[in-house]
Amino acid sequence: MNETCTAAVNINQDYCGRCSICHSICPYEAIKRDLETGKVEIDLQKCQVCGICYSACPVMAIDIVYYDYDGLAKYVECMHEKTGSETLVLMCRGNSPATGEIEEILQNEGLKVDNYIPLRLPCSGRIPTEFIFKALKLGTKNIVSIQCENEFCRFKQGTKINAQRIMLSKALLQQLGFSEDTLKVVKYSRKVVYETEKCVGCDKCVFICPYGAIEAQEFATPKITYEVCVGCGACALVCPHSAIQVKGFEFEDVLQRYSKSAERLKAESKFPLILVFCCQWSEFTALDDPKSLTLKKKAIAIEIPCFKALDPVHVVESLHSGFDGVMAVVCSKEDCKLREGGDTAERNIDVLRDVLKKMNLLERFELFTVSPRCVGEFNQKLDVFFKKIASMPPLKLAVAEAKNPCIKS
């Protein structure tokens, strides 16, 4: 841990009642308890900033930087006044889909909601019971919690913990006269989308899947066991015809997003232009408030579900699209929420660096490991990279054509 790191989670010992609830509920055993004194402290090396301990503390002795109780309540109040919406949709980072997907998920559950307040969180299990009642007091009539399926929770026990809280909250709300539909839980886990008509049966996805979710078939295209798929994106990278992709992170959609951003910013004579590919678990603020990057550093953030889903083709293509530098931000091996198959991602980066070196572009790409436990770490590394790229001349490359072997057809 960096000595200059400002911890995102702290226990206020003056408020702590030594009840040890946080110690017993932490899914990462990141809270140490002294058996003699009962004093509890957070081990920042193990903490994943899921916030479950924060929401469980009965005396609010735990301070947290991201998505604190007052901040969440203020956000709901502001959005309610701005949109007039009476529906609050809570989403875990692991399953928080694009806007269109939210509506699709709700419709599949028989819920038709045209206007809602989206609230994205590191884990749905961190929602305090008090916040549910606060949201209702602020004018919310319906709360929908889109949670990961139990076995796919990125914070181990987060979904189970939240399910228990929701059950207790619903029981209490009904006793107070609220409708049974006031609080609803929807289970959703991001998976791959498989278009078998595009598949040529090369079976690359079978060999690359670190979770054994894809099985080769003797006289047919591979079979995906969706009950095992975790949506890491490793298979999507090796598919030569984009027959298999992670829902919400389709290759062409990502390509269009950064290409159009580069075109717009170039027209405004912005320099330098920085593109950040960011694992959704390594950094919170940049992804949940992407406008801050554009305003402060002229940087665009593109979210990826995991380090394994960082496509080297996108790095090369983004430089051809007009960006002066590309920065990748991922979790360390110890912090990765999807640890299986990390060696594949590292090999991809080695190949990428070799290609960039041959193109004399290696200095315009950096890979950093970052954790949300250390406040400001991402901004520090972005500043360093920004200054480095700013010291170079603007990058002027010919726009890559479709025949380029690096570009997927």
Q: Where on the chain are the PLM-derived regions?
A:
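Mobile, glycine- and charge-enriched loop segments
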Residues: 82-125, 266-308, 399
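Ferredoxin-like iron-sulfur electron-transfer modules
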Residues: 1-18, 29-49, 67-77, 182-208, ...
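Gly-rich Lys/Arg/Thr-decorated short loops/hinges at beta-loop-alpha junctions or inter-strand turns
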Residues: 1-6, 111-117, 147, 216, ...
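Short Fe-S-cluster ligation motifs
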Residues: 50-61, 84-86, 229-245, 263-268, ...
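Local cysteine-cluster metal-coordination motifs and their immediate loop/turn environment
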Residues: 17-28, 45-59, 143, 148-157, ...
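A short, flexible N-terminal coil/short beta segment enriched in small residues
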Residues: 36-38, 62-94, 249-281
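Peripheral docking tails and interdomain loops at the edges
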Residues: 175-191, 197, 358-406
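Cofactor-cradling patches in redox/metallo enzymes
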Residues: 119-173, 303-378
